[in-house]
Amino acid sequence: MSQEFLARILEQKAREVEQMKLEQIQPLRQTYRLAEFLKNHQDRLQVIAEVKKASPSLGDINLDVDIVQQAQTYEENGAVMISVLTDEVFFKGHLDYLREISSQVEIPTLNKDFIIDEKQIIRARNAGATVILLIVAALAEERLKELYDYATVLGLEVLVETHNLAELEVAHRLGAQIIGVNNRNLTTFEVDLQTSVDLAKHFKDDCLYISESAIFTRQDAERLAPYFNGILVGTALMQAENVVQRIKELQIDKG
């Protein structure tokens, strides 16, 4: 995702937010706290499993998937959380997917989108999300803090996504509990697991870390297991002929 492409996405989001109604806040869906679960289950590399029909880099991935059945298969086979793409224009997602999945699973759900405004946070919570994504590259640091604090007041957890050391330092200054490292280079569009391995040298003991993107095989997961609490996996699961086998392969016991 080039910076130019990220800018296009953010321009689209700004247009969407302008048209978006401010919803009344509904009760928070009850499930366990992701951070607490990750802290208490550090003997395993946990899998956050994603429901994603398409992406800008790959195009259509799996348009015919039964999203609820896919999410329930994830849950039944050890996923710690379901990530749901809700961006319509670039990822062929929908807020209804989040609403449907959240109503049919017991575990936390993550609203995976480009969040730039409080209205989106309320909307995510009302649709059943208990965790939202905030992307450091998409927000000025002051605005990132405003949205992080707002989500926290609403009882939501936040996955703060980073791509490089400067962004990781922003996440640390923010006091983020759960920090993601996206292995996709924003400038070249290339993905490299070494991004996660390199940034792990700068991790703090009191934070929880999730590696995102480009994780396909058990070998990939084993490479990340020494450094991370969890991995976020989408394409590998959406393309898998045997979803159960694939998700089991990615859950690494650390012993």
Curated annotation (Swiss-Prot):
The keyword Amino-acid biosynthesis applies. It catalyses: 1-(2-carboxyphenylamino)-1-deoxy-D-ribulose 5-phosphate + H(+) = (1S,2R)-1-C-(indol-3-yl)glycerol 3-phosphate + CO2 + H2O. InterPro entries: Aldolase_TIM, Indole-3-glycerol_P_synth, Indole-3-glycerol_P_synth_dom, Indole-3-GlycerolPSynthase_CS, RibuloseP-bd_barrel. The keyword NAD does not apply. Keywords: Amino-acid biosynthesis, Aromatic amino acid biosynthesis, Decarboxylase, Lyase, Tryptophan biosynthesis. GO terms for biological process: L-tryptophan biosynthetic process. Pathway: Amino-acid biosynthesis; L-tryptophan biosynthesis; L-tryptophan from chorismate: step 4/5. It is an enzyme of class 4 (lyase). One of its GO terms (molecular function) is indole-3-glycerol-phosphate synthase activity. It comes from the Bacteria. PANTHER family: INDOLE-3-GLYCEROL-PHOSPHATE SYNTHASE, TRYPTOPHAN BIOSYNTHESIS PROTEIN. Belongs to the TrpC family. HAMAP family: IGPS_B. This is Indole-3-glycerol phosphate synthase. It comes from Streptococcus pneumoniae (strain Hungary19A-6). The lineage of its organism: Bacteria, Bacillati, Bacillota, Bacilli, Lactobacillales. The gene is trpC.
